[in-house]
């Protein structure tokens, strides 16, 4: 998933603002919220670093976002210490 945020005139002379945080002009390999971005005077273009699991046992498993790894973990509802098999992500 990717998006673009157009910078308002005079919004910042030092970089781009995303989710209340200032990022410098240029390439940002990872934001606080797990996006890879490019910041220019005109706009900020970002894409997610994570893929959303869609193919897994939804009855026995649940999805939990892991901000440290910038990915979704799919774990057993009964025992979250055990991972579930995921056969497709988008």
From Swiss-Prot:
Disulfide bonds join 2-16, 34-70, 37-46, 39-47, 61-84. Gene3D superfamilies: 2.20.25.590, Complement Module, domain 1. Keywords: Amidation, Disulfide bond, Secreted. GO terms for cellular component: extracellular region. Its main location: secreted. The modification Valine amide is found at residue 90. It is found in: Secreted. It holds the Pfam family PSP94. Signal peptide: none annotated. Belongs to the beta-microseminoprotein family. PANTHER family: BETA-MICROSEMINOPROTEIN. This is Beta-microseminoprotein.
């Amino acid at each position: 998933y990717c998006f673009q945020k157009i910078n308002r005139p005079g919004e910042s002379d030092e970089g781009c603002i995303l989710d209340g945080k200032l990022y410098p002009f240029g390439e940002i390999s990872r934001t606080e919220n797990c996006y890879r971005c490019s910041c220019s005077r005109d706009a900020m273009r970002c894409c997610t670093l994570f893929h959303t699991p869609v193919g897994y046992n939804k009855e026995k498993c649940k999805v939990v976002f892991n901000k440290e790894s910038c990915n979704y973990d799919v774990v057993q509802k009964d025992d979250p210490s055990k991972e579930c098999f995921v056969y497709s992500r988008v």
